């Protein structure tokens, strides 16, 4: 009887430890997702995001980007 009680206690302990580890892992995944989430800043709804096809004569790229005349797509404006 004592051995059965010890085995049941160990099984319960393993279940609790596993549940807390799964919860901790999901929390870690949420934090990492938030850190590495790439969101393009868009001031206007009609602006073009990074690497979008554009017209250099009518530059509609979002703030911080400029339509490249050679490639005709929005690139980061470095200066």
Swiss-Prot record:
Alphabetical keyword list: Disulfide bond, Ion channel impairing toxin, Knottin, Secreted, Signal, Toxin
Pfam family, one: Toxin_12
GO molecular function: ion channel inhibitor activity; toxin activity
GO cellular component, one term: extracellular region
Cysteine pairings via disulfide bonds: 47-62, 54-67, 61-74
Residues excised as propeptide: 20-45
Signal peptide segment: 1-19
Tissues expressing this chain: Expressed by the venom gland.
Subcellular location: Secreted
Role summary: Probable ion channel inhibitor.
Similarity annotation: Belongs to the neurotoxin 10 (Hwtx-1) family. 34 (Jztx-26) subfamily.
UniProt remark on domains: The presence of a 'disulfide through disulfide knot' structurally defines this protein as a knottin.
The name this protein goes by in its record: U16-theraphotoxin-Cg1b
Species name: Chilobrachys guangxiensis (Chinese earth tiger tarantula)
Upper lineage: Eukaryota, Metazoa, Ecdysozoa, Arthropoda, Chelicerata
